[in-house]
Amino acid sequence: VSKGFVVLAQNNKTVDYVTQAYALALSIKASQLEYNSISLITNDPVPKKYQKIFDQIIPIPFNDDAGNTEWKVENRWKIFHATPYDETIVLDTDMLMLEDISSWWEYCSNYDIKFCSRIKNYKLDVVEDKVHRKAFIANNLPNVYFALHYFKKSDTAYNFYKVLEFVCNNWEWSYDHFAVKEYQKWLSMDLTAAIVVDMMGLTETALDKNSPLEFIHMKVPLLGWPTGTVNWSSTVPVNLTSNGHLEVANIRQHKLFHYVEKDFITKSILKKLEAAANG
């Protein structure tokens, strides 16, 4: 049985998501003891230096549906069809893997599809997002985080992604029918996936409060700081050690770190990640 991580990256005018994916791949190579394969789905050019870190570089299947949109999420439903693995963990590009998560694979292999539904702040406290998740709360939808989920090649996962394709391609109609309160005027994978989980009756099986799946979420409104703070990385000290440990405000960060800020991956951080991956 093949197991691996998959990330979909499409650069826009301001953000180099391919470099973020490279940084994530380096962190996976540095931290994972058992499963460290990562494949990149992209139509963007991948620098030669980056290419060797990826198990496979896969073109986006069925044409590019994202066009000129800023967030480039329109192709995410294709991940199921593009993954080269029997079992896949899907990640967002703007993340770093800081510790071995072999136990996650062990846990997830008992299921066809599993979503993260728990996030923490950099102080390692569990947080509930009431700022960005008003539509979830108002419409009683499951607390799905698409940025971290697992699936195995199975009928359940295939059907989930088929319905996801429909909801992505008809998101305004779908939101009108399933998320009409606190109406969201843009396509979001979290809300879309939550609607699909709910429609398919997967809430009990695809989400689990006791699941090990979690990540540290650095969206500023979740950090409990005064409103008006813009950048977390210029507000608290950040230190990435040469062996790939990340400290924020002198607190060592665990497992999976979702840094969110688009300019977080500097040349010096890339160098340290390269050293850790080659170490």
Q: Each predicted region: which residue ranges?
A:
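A short, glycine/small-residue-rich beta-strand->loop->alpha-helix junction that serves as a flexible
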Residues: 12-21
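Short, polar loop motifs at secondary-structure junctions
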Residues: 41-48, 99-100, 211
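Active-site regions of enzymes building and remodeling cell-envelope glycoconjugates
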Residues: 51-64
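A short, glycine-/small-residue-rich helix N-cap motif at loop->alpha-helix starts
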Residues: 64-74
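Conserved catalytic core of nucleotide-sugar-dependent glycosyltransferases
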Residues: 106-168
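GT-A fold catalytic core of metal-dependent nucleotide-sugar glycosyltransferases
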Residues: 59, 72-125
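A glycosyltransferase accessory/donor-loop signature
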Residues: 1-8, 18, 40, 53-54, ...
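Short, acidic, metal-binding catalytic loop of nucleotide-sugar glycosyltransferases
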Residues: 27-35
